[in-house]
């Protein structure tokens, strides 16, 4: 009888405690997200290389990019008008929402030879010093693993040409050392990481 009571107590504690260990539900999409999904896809998983995947991106990176678009430190003919008049709270809500979404694989199949060259270039230029191992990103440094290939190429070329300079000089410095082939190699490598 004593064993049964002990078992019953432990079982009831586990049942009562289980909601405390349950995962919190994903945050509801803020109203402004309805506009974002037209380009960035459902839950921030872009299905075209023209637009970056926002799902799983770092909160701080998303928030700072929205601020930079609004302050004209970064420019894009489609994105810049979207942030005009956006409030700080709306930016925070969007960054919070998209950072908590799960990124999905793009289906990109890297060219093995280019990806191998890209890995060597990424190692030589110390990409993981900022983007971390697995290119997961941190704080204001973006997650680039599994990002859209075309988008990676476009951004590396923009950093190289210094048409995108909202990076504090880090990426413009690194990209300036890359040839166009190097950029394609690195993009093959990074876009293929899942």
Residue ranges and their predicted role:
Residues 32-41, 60, 64-67, 92-96, ...:
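C-type cytochrome heme c attachment motif
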Residues 23-45, 106, 110-133, 148:
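Sequence/structural segment immediately N-terminal to covalent heme-attachment motifs in c-type
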Residues 45-46, 75, 100-113, 128, ...:
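Inter-heme linker and motif-flanking segments adjacent to c-type heme-binding CXXCH motifs
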Residues 84-106, 150, 176-194:
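C-terminal capping alpha-helices of c-type cytochrome domains
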